[in-house]
């Protein structure tokens, strides 16, 4: 397998860590990564709230609209954009969802900050994000990271400490092997107290940067408690 479609929400810390891993695999094997979108805000929409495309600025959705416009020019621009906003939020604890920060990050990846305004002024960028999102929903998916490999849809792998080098290739073999077994539906590791502590440590930058409540399948996730902040 030489091509993978990788669906992400830029605000998801787990998808970002998985993206770090898949980039390492690409560096070693030369695989092609097609970056695609998925909105956790939309899939977890609370009744009575506006859809993200009904707001002038929606944190993850607007960042993906910018990415959609960049992708029309070149996938490598979206590649750099996701790397930049992911590093800002999930490593530095910054706020790429702040328009001023987003403009700075656009300059950092070598494009004009006015791309932000162009993406928001173009209603078809909504369509691009919606189409990617709906592809996952139609396949029965609910979150990110979601991968498509040779027509197979896989959720995961869910990582907080992405492997590199030979270990990254070992995980790639597991993932591609599972894609070749279409009736294997789930393989999950229980989390020990030590695992929970590791996850909490890795989520601290995300907690510093976020300005929203985390929701999973309609329920609020108390990540602050997990990280020992409440």
UniProtKB/Swiss-Prot annotation:
SUPFAM superfamilies recorded: Thioredoxin-like (SSF52833)
Gene3D superfamilies linked: Glutaredoxin
InterPro entries from the UniProt entry: Rv2466c-like, Thioredoxin-like_sf
Name under which the protein is recorded: Uncharacterized protein MT2344
